[in-house]
């Protein structure tokens, strides 16, 4: 298995749903060896209905290596894999068992990081066509438009119910992850608001992340630190949160993006026009001992770009490459 603790701070091409010639060439032409997959909507590579199987995971990792790439992490099983566990519904123990099997299979296949979230209804936006710099299109969120949205489930769910379900889940999963040698990386709620459609969103603040790390207290449990989601919470908390968690070795990888504005209203942005000085973010990660990988994550939709936003991703990764070179030289 890839020893993530022995590698330097580095860039990765991320949010891939499949490994194809386009993705391979994109990474190689940018000089990036490390990659990450996001399987939130499923994937041709990992076709399971309840869990991911060992041979499928092994084939994916081997295909990456055959292409000269290193598979660092997979994030987000399809939410149907564990929605009963998230809501504490009948059948949650069976779903937890399937998730345990998935993590065991990832370990056997030599995939070191599994990124996950606890956002029952996923990512919410109220617009996908807001205009950013130069007419590029970005997603945006305005809490006023959805604060009273109808229930997405049969009833409301409180903070403490969701915390109880999270505690039950993570304490069942972590021992398996430790045994399998897999690191679990928790992503914030996006948007980080108190509730949506009657369901509490608990991974929304610095204090709540401290609580989550205390509940799941293990060297194999840490953060997928999404800078954009933390910036949505409060731009002023981003650097203190990095110092706190990175100094403890709790940041396993980073979604390196930003937004303009904070909850209750924000829009996504190019990497150099958001709330934060992203070079200071990169420098703080380095100074705090972070040695994981950084990926570009969400990017604006530039004119005449591909469906995967190759132009916009290349712009973001180019900016990130220069920042990383500068912090390494210093």
Where are the predicted features?
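Structural motif corresponding to the early beta-alpha repeats
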Residues: 41-167, 178-179, 229
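Residue-level "edge-of-site" marker
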Residues: 17, 40, 77, 119, ...
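Histidine-acidic metal/acid-base catalytic patches
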Residues: 1-10, 17-21, 26-28, 62-66, ...
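Non-cysteine beta-strand/loop elements that form the S-adenosyl-L-methionine
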Residues: 32-40, 74, 116, 143, ...
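Active-site-proximal beta-alpha loop/turn segments in soluble metabolic enzymes
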Residues: 146-162, 188-198, 302-304
């Amino acid at each position: 298995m890839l020893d993530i603790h022995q590698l330097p701070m580095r860039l990765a091409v991320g949010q891939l749903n499949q490994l194809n010639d386009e993705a391979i060439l994109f990474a190689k032409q940018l000089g990036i060896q490390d990659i990450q997959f996001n399987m939130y909507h499923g994937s041709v590579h990992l076709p399971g209905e309840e869990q991911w199987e060992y041979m499928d995971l092994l084939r994916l990792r081997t295909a990456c290596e055959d292409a000269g790439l290193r598979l660092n992490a997979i994030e987000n099983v399809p939410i149907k894999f564990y929605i009963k566990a998230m809501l504490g519904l009948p059948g949650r123990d069976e779903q937890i068992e399937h998730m345990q099997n998935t993590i065991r299979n990832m370990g056997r296949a030599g995939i070191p990081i599994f990124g996950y979230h606890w956002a029952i209804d996923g990512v919410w936006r109220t617009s996908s066509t807001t205009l950013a710099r130069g007419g590029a299109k970005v997603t945006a969120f305005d809490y006023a438009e959805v604060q009273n949205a109808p229930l997405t489930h049969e009833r409301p769910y409180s903070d403490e119910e969701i915390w109880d379900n999270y505690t039950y889940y993570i304490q069942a999963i972590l021992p398996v992850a430790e045994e399998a040698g897999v690191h679990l990386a928790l992503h914030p709620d996006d948007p980080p608001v108190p509730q949506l459609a009657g369901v509490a969103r608990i991974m929304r603040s610095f204090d709540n992340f401290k609580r989550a790390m205390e509940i799941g207290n293990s060297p194999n449990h840490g953060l997928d630190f999404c800078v954009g989601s933390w910036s949505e919470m409060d731009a002023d908390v981003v650097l203190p949160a990095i110092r706190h968690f990175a100094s403890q070795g709790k940041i396993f990888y980073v979604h390196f993006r930003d937004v303009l504005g904070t909850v209750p209203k924000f829009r996504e942005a190019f990497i150099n026009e958001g709330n934060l000085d992203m070079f200071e973010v990169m420098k703080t990660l380095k100074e705090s001992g972070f040695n994981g990988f950084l990926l570009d994550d969400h990017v604006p939709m530039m004119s005449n770009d591909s469906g995967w936003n190759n132009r916009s991703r290349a712009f973001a990764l180019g900016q990130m490459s220069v920042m990383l070179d500068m912090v390494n030289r210093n």
